[in-house]
């Protein structure tokens, strides 16, 4: 019997907003649900981390000086809970079993994060959506994604974004930007390479956890990647 794969998919909050740039676009929720459903159909265990940038970012909230960075980050954590509940609804409407687990206790809305409980949910075929970041300010949701992936013993992290993968410089600004299909953890931490923040990449490196960056709007892309086709994405791993 083939061993079941376990993955953690990281979605940016901005992606949920679509062309609006703010809030949650129902059509994108439906698309995400259909993509995740294909993974579950193929006996893949799925955890999800979602950002909160479509509602508020802690760094941005603190820029004016009125709101402290810690308070801004707390607001950002709450934004991820809003997004997690939205994704839960979309997944459940598609026929999947889902649990939201928050790093901050809020029993009226969702479970509190417990590593072993999350693992049991995954083993039973439920999708687990991890909300409220790490529960601590100054840590990004990218770092949350790596941390939760390590804790649940995921085979890889897939960062589903609005671009095809990683370039040596910003392709929107430079026509000669080169697409990087494979790169090392150390290369991913270079200033001109924007994969994740250094804390997230260092944690992935320490645990030999592959990071795949792909276009979330490419239909069937997530399943292809997990099945071994990384031709349309970038992968960060040991050389």
UniProtKB/Swiss-Prot annotation:
Asked if the record carries the keyword Coiled coil, the reply is no
Q: What does the UniProt entry say about where the protein is found? A: Cytoplasm
Q: What is its EC number?
A: 2.7.4.22
Query: Which transformation does this protein catalyse, written as a reaction?
Result: UMP + ATP = UDP + ADP
Top-level taxon of the source organism: Bacteria
Principal cellular location given in the protein's record = cytoplasm
Pathway where this protein functions:
Pyrimidine metabolism; CTP biosynthesis via de novo pathway; UDP from UMP (UMPK route): step 1/1
Which InterPro entries does the UniProt entry name for this protein?
AceGlu_kinase-like_sf, Asp/Glu/Uridylate_kinase, Uridylate_kinase, Uridylate_kinase_bac
Q: How is its activity regulated?
A: Allosterically activated by GTP. Inhibited by UTP.
Molecular function per GO: ATP binding; UMP kinase activity
The answer on whether this UniProt entry bears the keyword ATP-binding reads: yes
Q: Where does ATP bind?
A: 10-13, 53, 57, 161, 167, 170
Biological processes, Gene Ontology terms: 'de novo' CTP biosynthetic process; UDP biosynthetic process
One short Pfam family name for this protein? AA_kinase
Q: What are the entry keywords?
A: Allosteric enzyme, ATP-binding, Cytoplasm, Kinase, Nucleotide-binding, Pyrimidine biosynthesis, Transferase
| Xref: PANTHER family | URIDYLATE KINASE, URIDYLATE KINASE PUMPKIN, CHLOROPLASTIC
The free-text function statement in the UniProt record for this protein reads: Catalyzes the reversible phosphorylation of UMP to UDP.
Name the UniProt record assigns to this protein: Uridylate kinase
* Protein's organism: Campylobacter jejuni subsp. doylei (strain ATCC BAA-1458 / RM4099 / 269.97)
Organism lineage: Bacteria, Pseudomonadati, Campylobacterota, Epsilonproteobacteria, Campylobacterales
């Amino acid at each position: 019997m083939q061993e079941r794969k376990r993955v953690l998919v990281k979605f940016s909050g901005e992606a949920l907003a679509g062309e609006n740039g703010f809030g949650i676009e129902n059509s994108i929720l439906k698309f995400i649900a259909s993509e995740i459903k294909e993974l579950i159909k193929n006996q893949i265990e799925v955890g999800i981390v979602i950002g909160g940038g479509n509602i508020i970012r802690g760094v941005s909230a603190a820029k004016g000086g009125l709101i402290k960075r810690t308070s801004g980050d707390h607001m950002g954590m709450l934004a991820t809970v809003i997004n997690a509940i939205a994704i839960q609804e979309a997944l459940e409407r598609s026929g999947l079993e889902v649990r939201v687990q928050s790093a901050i206790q809020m029993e009226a809305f969702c479970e509190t994060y417990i590593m072993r409980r999350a693992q049991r949910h995954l083993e039973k075929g439920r999708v687990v959506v991890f909300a409220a970041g790490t529960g601590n300010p100054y840590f990004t949701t990218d770092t949350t994604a790596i941390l939760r992936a390590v804790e649940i013993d995921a085979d890889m992290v897939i960062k589903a974004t609005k671009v095809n993968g990683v370039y040596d410089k910003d392709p929107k600004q430079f026509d000669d930007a080169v697409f990087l299909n494979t790169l090392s953890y150390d290369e991913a931490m270079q200033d001109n390479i924007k994969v994740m923040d250094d804390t997230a990449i260092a944690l992935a490196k320490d645990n030999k956890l592959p990071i795949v960056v792909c276009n979330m709007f490419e239909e069937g892309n997530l399943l292809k990647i997990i099945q071994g086709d990384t031709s349309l994405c970038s992968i960060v791993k040991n050389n």
